[in-house]
């Protein structure tokens, strides 16, 4: 029973590391292909990563053109 909290903490660390890796891949893809004059940025949300554009009001998902 003592290892259950440790297991949960390790699971949370692994999930945040996976999100960070996905975010860096998305940022690298943005650097290679600038979207809308480099107005794009990556935002972490509760549901994962979103590609947003500074030209829109708020965080508009800019996966589509």
From Swiss-Prot:
Primary location: secreted
Signal sequence segment: 1-18
Annotated function: Probable neurotoxin with unknown target. Possibly targets ion channels.
Protein name as annotated: Conotoxin Cal1.5
InterPro entries, sorted: T-conotoxin
Biological source species: Californiconus californicus
Chain positions with 4-hydroxyproline modification: 61
Alphabetic keyword roster: Disulfide bond, Hydroxylation, Ion channel impairing toxin, Neurotoxin, Secreted, Signal, Toxin
GO molecular function: ion channel regulator activity; toxin activity
Entry similarity comment: Belongs to the conotoxin T superfamily.
One Gene Ontology term, aspect cellular component: extracellular region
Transmembrane regions: none
Record-linked Pfam families: Chi-conotoxin (PF16981)
Entry remark concerning the domains of this protein: The cysteine framework is X (CC-CX[hydroxyPro]C).
Propeptide: 19-49
Location(s) in or outside the cell: Secreted
Expression by tissue: Expressed by the venom duct.
Annotated disulfide bonds: 52-62, 53-59
